[in-house]
A protein has these predicted regions:
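Conserved pre-ATP/AMP-binding loop-to-beta segment of ANL
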Residues: 19-21, 135, 153-183, 190, ...
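Conserved AMP-binding/adenylate-forming core of the ANL superfamily
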Residues: 23-72, 76, 93-98, 147-156, ...
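Conserved AMP-binding A3 loop
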Residues: 33-37, 179-205
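Structural core segment of the AMP-binding/adenylate-forming
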Residues: 52-53, 80-154, 487
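Conserved AMP-binding/adenylation subdomain of ANL enzymes
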Residues: 202-222, 226-290, 298
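Gly/Ser/Thr-rich phosphate-binding loop
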Residues: 265-269, 277-345, 358, 442
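Conserved ATP-binding/catalytic segment of the ANL
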Residues: 353-420, 425
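Conserved C-terminal "lid"/linker of ANL adenylate-forming enzymes
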Residues: 443-446, 490-547
Length: 547
């Protein structure tokens, strides 16, 4: 069946699947299920309440919350009312959230709890267009922020008056209508509001559906933030389109335990997650056996996205009998462009273009894409839109090549390309992936643009360093230990020995603490913010070139 919009899709699936479980989530420490009927009723109530509150088609509604069932219900409710969801990552500071919501012109805002409500109150004067705030947690409700439960009840009570209008709005919504504005977290510069239509998101969910196994009852354990397009499409909308059970991990920290309890068939993650799980397994005598056990007895599908997956990680999983595959996409493409399938894959590749997507490589190596999932443009930024949407193609900003079998290989970001003072060009991600292949290296970022050699900021795997060198002391103490510096220099030299001379890291800064989204040095999808890291370590890096 072809669907005109996401609201119609959800209502149809909820009616078709009825008592079957749609969501599984923890309540007071125990997992409980929400049926498709309950899910559909809640979405309808949310949409009704928004209409009764005066929300018009095309109005923007903000969503500032952690992953939880209410996030999905609010998302679908906003769109069922014909409005546009503007999600903010839960960890975003109040001032940053205010900038995004003000730019989008949000008129209503959903928040999850007291902490998020405090952010909203802190910047409320900067958001005069906000007419109301709804808080999911009943305990955090206040006169200026009514509780979610009461909001839904008002929606149910109003259905006698709003039902016909909801049906009219659903009928009027087309694939060209705006569904969401998703602000890119951005590794550099200010975030841009990516305008995705109902057609963009529906087409991508349909395209991904072709890869879903037909012989298994899918249980997908979701943990990546829904404010990021990877989880929003590949977990949320994919589960609605395919009609399978979406289980919620309690948190990223509890994910290993949640896997054992839920016993999922599918998990999606970013490279950092797969690396950490592999590192944990390698602490035991039989890593492949331990790694298999860590993902439960029912696992059928592990998909990596959000950033390039180092080939060594993929090989280790496949050697353990785990079907880890890599895909590629961007927020601007809703997001999936390519997928490795279980039947057709290349370890080093990001896979083949999904049905309906065309790819080509520009003369300078940039990957270009077109298809029904490519965004409408950037909100209020026509010049930025014109720069990336040209002659019917979306210019991804990524570099790569396509082999004779149609597999895409990502080699780096165009803007990250390092040009040394001798004119030699280096793709930093390639060097970084080699460094990360050493178990003693936790994180690494390479620099050297317009310099005469490469340098890096390296975060060691301190547990492994302590074990190998039989050392004690804090991370900060070890970072200053000459024995550690000498050891790591030998490791780096050995790792890069087979690379070209200009691709070798001559000197580096040893950093005791990891890069994180909280430190402002990674995006929410765990991509390095190179400029932020360089700024923080500018003095140390400059000294390396002065020595």
């Amino acid at each position: 069946m072809t669907f005109r919009n996401l609201g119609q899709l959800h209502r149809t699936q909820a009616a078709r699947l009825g008592p079957k479980p749609a969501m599984r989530h923890r309540v007071h420490g125990l997992y409980r299920d929400t049926s498709w009927t309950e899910y559909g009723d809640a979405v309808r109530a949310c949409a009704s309440a928004l209409v009764a509150a005066g929300v018009k088609p095309g109005d923007r509604v903000g969503l500032l919350a952690e992953n939880r069932p209410e996030w999905l219900i609010a998302d679908m409710g906003i769109m069922a009312a014909g409005a546009v969801n503007v999600p903010c990552h839960a960890g975003i500071p109040a001032a940053a959230a205010a900038r995004l919501l003000a730019d989008a012109g949000a008129s209503w805002l959903f928040v999850s709890n007291a902490a998020q409500l405090a952010k909203a109150r802190e910047v409320r004067k900067e958001l005069p267009a906000i007419r109301g705030v709804i808080v999911f947690d009943r305990s955090a409700a206040a006169p200026d922020a009514p509780a979610w439960a009461g909001f839904l009840q008002r929606g149910r009570d109003a259905l006698r008056d709003t039902a016909a209008e909801l049906d009219r709005r659903e009928d009027a919504l087309t694939g060209d209508d705006l569904a969401t504005i998703m602000y890119t977290s951005g590794t550099t510069g200010l975030p841009k509001g990516v305008m995705l239509t109902h057609g963009n998101l529906l087409s991508n969910a349909e395209q991904v559906l072709d890869y879903a196994p037909k012989d298994v009852d899918i249980v997908l354990l979701s943990w990546l933030p829904f404010s990021h397009i990877f989880a929003r499409l590949c977990d949320h909308y994919f589960s609605v389109r395919a009609g399978f059970l979406l289980a919620f991990a309690e948190s990223a920290d509890t994910l290993p335990a949640d896997i054992q309890e839920v016993q999922p068939t599918h998990i999606h993650g970013v490279p950092r997650f797969w690396e950490k799980m592999l590192a944990a397994a390698r602490a035991y005598p039989d890593p492949p056996k331990v790694l298999r056990a860590m993902f439960g007895r029912r696992i059928k599908w592990l998909m990596s996205g959000g950033a390039p997956l180092p080939p060594e990680i993929c090989k280790a999983y496949r050697a353990a009998g785990l079907p880890l595959l890599q895909g590629y996409g961007l927020t601007e493409t809703a997001p999936v462009l390519t997928i490795n399938s279980p039947d057709e894959f290349r370890v080093e590749s990001a896979g083949k273009a999904i049905p309906g997507v065309e790819l080509k490589i520009a003369p300078d190596g940039e990957i270009l894409a077109r298809g029904p999932n490519v965004m409408k443009g950037y909100w209020n930024q026509p010049q930025a839109t014109a720069e990336v949407l040209r002659d019917g193609w979306f210019y991804t900003g990524d570099l790569g090549h396509i082999d004779s079998d149609g597999f895409l290989y990502i080699t780096g970001r165009k803007k990250d390309l390092i040009v040394l003072s001798n004119g030699k060009k280096v793709t930093p991600s390639g060097v970084e992936n080699l460094l990360l292949s050493d178990p003693h290296v936790e994180q690494a970022v390479v620099y050297g643009d317009r310099r005469n050699f490469l340098t890096a900021v390296v975060v060691p795997n301190w547990a492994k360093v302590r074990q190998t060198l039989s050392l004690t002391g804090s991370d900060e103490e070890l970072a200053k230990n000459p024995a550690v510096e000498e050891f790591l220099h030998k490791r780096v030299d050995a790792i890069l020995a087979e690379t070209a001379a200009w691709e070798q890291v001559k000197k580096f800064v040893i950093r005791p603490t990891p890069f994180t989204p909280e430190s402002g040095e990674m995006t929410v999808s765990l991509k390095l913010k190179r400029d932020a890291i360089r700024t923080r370590h500018a003095t140390e890096l400059d000294k390396l070139y002065a020595e």
